[in-house]
Design a protein with these regions (language model features):
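Acidic-leg catalytic submotif of subtilisin-like serine proteases
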Residues: 122-125, 153-214, 291
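Active-site-proximal beta-strand/loop segments in catalytic clefts of secreted hydrolases
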Residues: 48-50, 107-108, 125-130, 163, ...
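Hydrolase catalytic cores
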Residues: 227-231, 239-250, 265, 270, ...
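Extracellular S/T/G-rich loop segment that most often corresponds to the catalytic His/Ser-adjacent loop
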Residues: 184-186, 190, 315, 330-408, ...
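Autoinhibitory propeptides
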Residues: 21-39, 77-156
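C-terminal subdomain of the subtilisin-like protease fold in secreted/lumenal serine endopeptidases
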Residues: 269-295, 300-306, 339-341, 350-355, ...
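Fungal secretory targeting signals
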Residues: 1-19
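Substrate-binding/charge-relay-adjacent region of secreted/lumenal peptidase catalytic domains
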Residues: 159-162, 185-188, 223-232, 254-292
C-alpha cells in the first residue's frame, strides 16, 4: 500500500529521501519530485515564500500567464499545433493562511525555468497521481483484495486469477476487476470472428478481410474462439474490451504470409488512427490497443519484423509459441522479440504436452481444453487446445492491464505505458515456478491478473510470487481421459483446427454436456487429492 507522502525541505537531507531534487542553478528554486509516485507530465505545483504579499501574488499570476501565452504562441507557429492540450497554463491557485500560498498548472520546461528564477518562489514540485487508501486496494504478492467473481468460469480464467494450483474451491472462480478491458481495442488477426455472438455484447466488429474474394465471416471458428477468450462476457479475460476481426486465414485455417503481414499492417494503421482521434478529442476514454496472433509456421524474418514494427508503434502484441513440442525460436512469429510469446499450460500446472518452449517463450497461460465462443450460431461454444488458446489469455490480460491506466484524454494521464514496459511488468508479476515438465532455458512463469485488484501500480509493486510445488496425483485418469476425448476430435497443428470440422457442431454439444455433467465430480476428486 502506498504510504502517505510527507514532504518538508528539512526531510530532504535524510539518508533515503522520498523526494529528489533536480539541480539548482544559482539561487533558482528547486524542483521536487517524489521517488515513489507516478508523475503527471508537464504539471507542477508552485509554492510562494511566506513573505509574499497578495499584490505580489496577483502580479505573479499575470506574469506567468503572459509567459505561458507567449510560449504557446511560439510553439503553435512552429511544429506543435496541439500544445493547448498538453500545456494548459494556470489551473488552481492556493492560499491556506500564510503557510501555503501558491498555484498549479501545466507548463513547458522553459516556462518552469523562468518560474524557478523568480525571487518569490520557494519551490516547485512535479504533480503526481494519488490513490485512495482503501484496504481493498492493498495488494500483496498473493493478490488478496476485493474483486468481482465469475462463478462457473472456464478453468483458464480461474487459473490466471489465483496464485496457487487450482483447488476444488477455486477451479471455476475467476477473480477480476469489472472494468477490465474498457477503452481498449483488441485486434484478432486470425480466421475472423463471429461478431454476432451474444458473449461479445455488441463489442465485436468486423475490421478487415485480407484474402481476396473471401467473405466477412469466420468460416473456421478458430478466430472466434480466440476472441472469446480475450473479451467475451463469460469466456473472456478482459470483459469490456472491443474486438476487431482481422481475417488473414481462410475457412480451412490457412493463408499466405503476405496476407498475414498485410493484416498486421492494417491493425497498426488502425491503432494509429485511434491514437490520433483520442488526441484530437474525437474519441474519449481510449486506453490503447492489443493484438493476438495465434498462428505461425517456420522461421520467417518478414513476419517477425512486421510484428516488431507493430509493437514499436504502440500495439501490445501476444503471439502463440507453437504446438510442436520444440524450440519456439525456430518458429515465427514466436521468435519476434518485441511481442509476448506464449506457451500453453494444463489444469494440473504442467506444460501442455504439445507446447513449444525455450528462451523465446516469455510466459505460459492455460491452453489445454479451453472453452470459448464458436461459430454456427450466436450461442455456440467449443472446447479446443493449443498455444493458440494460451495466447488470447495473454492478449486479454494485456488489454485488462491497459484498461487500468488513465485514458489518453484524461488530464491525469501518464505518459502512455509502452509495450516494452507492459511486457516487463507482465513478466515481473507472474507466478514463478508453478509449472512442471519445463525444459532448460524456458522461463517458468505463469500469467497472473492481479487477483481481481484494480490498482495496477500496487499489483506491479507487489511483484512476483513463488509457487509452492505440489506432488502430482496418480488419481487423475478420468480427467485425463476426458481431455484426450476432447483432443481426439480436434487435432491442433500450428495453432489451427484441421480435423473433424464437419462433425464439430454435434460432437461439441455432446462433449459440452459431458463436461458439465462430469467436471465437478472429477475435478473434486482430482483437486482434493493433489491438495494433500
Amino acid at each position: 500500500m502506498r504510504g502517505l507522502l510527507a514532504l518538508s525541505l528539512a526531510a530532504c537531507a535524510a539518508a533515503a529521501p522520498a523526494v529528489s531534487h533536480e539541480s539548482i542553478h544559482g539561487d533558482a528554486a528547486p524542483i521536487l519530485s517524489s521517488s515513489n509516485a507516478e508523475v503527471v507530465p508537464n504539471s507542477y505545483i508552485i509554492k510562494f515564500k511566506k513573505h509574499v504579499t497578495d499584490d505580489k501574488i496577483s502580479d505573479h499570476h499575470t506574469w506567468i500567464q503572459k509567459i505561458h501565452s507567449s510560449r504557446m504562441d511560439l510553439k503553435k507557429r512552429s511544429q506543435m499545433p496541439m500544445v493547448d492540450d498538453v500545456f494548459r497554463g494556470l489551473k488552481h491557485t492556493y492560499k491556506i493562511g500564510q503557510d501555503f500560498m501558491g498555484y498549479s498548472g501545466h507548463f513547458d520546461e522553459d516556462t518552469i525555468e523562468a518560474v524557478r528564477r523568480h525571487p518569490d518562489v520557494e519551490y516547485i514540485e512535479r504533480d503526481s497521481i494519488v490513490h485512495t487508501m482503501s484496504v481493498s486496494e492493498d495488494v500483496d504478492s498473493e493478490g488478496k483484495c476485493d474483486s468481482d467473481i465469475e462463478k462457473s468460469a472456464p478453468w483458464g480464467l480461474a487459473r490466471i486469477s489465483h496464485r496457487d494450483t487450482l483447488s476444488f474451491a477455486t477451479f471455476n472462480k475467476y477473480l477480476y476487476a469489472a472494468e477490465g478491458g474498457e477503452g481498449v481495442d483488441a485486434y484478432v488477426i486470425d480466421t475472423g470472428t463471429n461478431v454476432e455472438h451474444v458473449d461479445f455484447e455488441g463489442r465485436a466488429k468486423w475490421g478487415k478481410t485480407i484474402p481476396n474474394g473471401d467473405a466477412d465471416v469466420d468460416g473456421n471458428g478458430h478466430g472466434t474462439h480466440c476472441s472469446g477468450t480475450i473479451a467475451g462476457k463469460k469466456y473472456g479475460v478482459a470483459k469490456k474490451a472491443s474486438v476487431y476481426a482481422v481475417k488473414v486465414l481462410r475457412s480451412n485455417g490457412s493463408g499466405t504470409m503476405a496476407d498475414v503481414v498485410a493484416g498486421v499492417e492494417w491493425a497498426a494503421k488502425s491503432h494509429l488512427e485511434q491514437v490520433k482521434a483520442a488526441k484530437d478529442g474525437k474519441r474519449k476514454g481510449f486506453k490503447g490497443s492489443v493484438a493476438n496472433m495465434s498462428l505461425g509456421g517456420g522461421k520467417t524474418q518478414a513476419l517477425d519484423d512486421t510484428v516488431n514494427a507493430a509493437v514499436s508503434v504502440g500495439i501490445h502484441f501476444a503471439v502463440a509459441a507453437g504446438n510442436d513440442n520444440a524450440d519456439a525460436c525456430n518458429y515465427s512469429p514466436a521468435a519476434a522479440a518485441k511481442a509476448v510469446t506464449v506457451g500453453a499450460s494444463a489444469i494440473d500446472d504442467s506444460r501442455a504436452y504439445f507446447s513449444n518452449y525455450g528462451k523465446c517463450t516469455d510466459i505460459f497461460a492455460p491452453g489445454l481444453s479451453i472453452l470459448s465462443t464458436w461459430i454456427g450460431s450466436k450461442y455456440a461454444t467449443n472446447t479446443i487446445s493449443g498455444t493458440s488458446m494460451a495466447s488470447p489469455h495473454i492478449c486479454g490480460l494485456l488489454a485488462y492491464y491497459l484498461s487500468l491506466q488513465p485514458s489518453s484524454d484524461s488530464e491525469y494521464s501518464l505518459a502512455t505505458i509502452s509495450p516494452e514496459k507492459m511486457k516487463a511488468n507482465l513478466l515481473k508479476i507472474a507466478t514463478v515456478g508453478a509449472l512442471s515438465d519445463m525444459p532448460r532455458d524456458t522461463p517458468n512463469l505463469l500469467a497472473w491478473n492481479g487477483g481481481g485488484c484494480s490498482n495496477y501500480s500496487a499489483i506491479v509493486d507487489a511483484g512476483s510470487y513463488k509457487a509452492t510445488p505440489k506432488a502430482q496425483s496418480d488419481k487423475i485418469s478420468s480427467v485425463s481421459e476426458l481431455e484426450k476425448a476432447i483432443e481426439h476430435d480436434y487435432e491442433v497443428i500450428s495453432g489451427k483446427v484441421v480435423k473433424g470440422v464437419s462433425s464439430l457442431s454435434d460432437k461439441a454439444e455432446k462433449l459440452s454436456e459431458k463436461i458439465h455433467d462430469m467436471v465437478e465430480e472429477e475435478l473434486k476428486e482430482f483437486l482434493e487429492e493433489i491438495a494433500h
